[in-house]
């Protein structure tokens, strides 16, 4: 009797898992469509304004390139949405499978490296004010951005070089053509260390140094010039951290399945694979958040929004930290000068 019931229970469990997976897939398609539209429109607007309407400054160059990375990420999301709608059938061929994966990973690395460069730039600007006033140029910012894009391509290729289409009787899938679990595990660790951990350490150290520096400034809202970039960095790491946690759990599940496979584990993995879509949606969400952060964290944004979007972005990307530190440096020199004059009078 038990032998008769067991297969029935397994069939019911599998059927429930399929229904759940299908429902989650539809929700994710809807979320990805929203992210794609807002990401393309929002970042397209930032690119248009910072690239064509605003005066070129170092900050404008940083955020222009960040918007380009997010725009590419959002635009290529269209191909993933179509694939998800077709129940993960990939109709675009081998080259687009590789290119779509390359752009997705490349954009992630570029965003991370740009945020790291912005943090280091802010750190140097707060500690070495004279250097920031004389050596910090738009040309150098453009060269650094070019190097960042080249480095992003180099870091991305090992992760996507094995991407290919897998054709079966029922559908064609865009897959990572890695057979060995150990190779996949190394890729997960590599992506986490290079694309998340090291940048996080550098960015954290930069803002600790900035905090130490501005603590000595006797100004109200002394961290105000840094709040937009801080918000951008925090949103990036909060959006991407669950993705890397998921990847390590996925590796653990694969190891479990390799050593002790079971129907229950397979059913759980099927639902877990759909949870991945929500986690990826959170990572994708980061690509459309930045334009909203620029606008809503801008000082008096409602008043400036009525006048011009250009003014909103100019205010958001203003290099106030340099002006703040320059004023502090000048007042310090002035007080020293007055002190020196007093001694001579005696």
Question: What is each PLM-predicted segment?
Answer:
Residues 75-78, 154-161, 197-204, 233-252, ...:
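Hydrophobic alpha-helical segments of membrane proteins
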Residues 24-33, 58-118, 125-135:
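Extracellular TM2-ECL1-early TM3 structural module of rhodopsin-like
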Residues 1-41, 45, 179, 188, ...:
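Extracellular N-terminal segment of 7TM GPCRs
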Residues 1-19, 168, 257-270, 299-346:
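Intrinsically disordered regulatory tails of 7TM GPCRs
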Residues 64-67, 108, 142-146, 190, ...:
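Internal alpha-helical transmembrane segments of multi-pass membrane proteins, especially GPCRs
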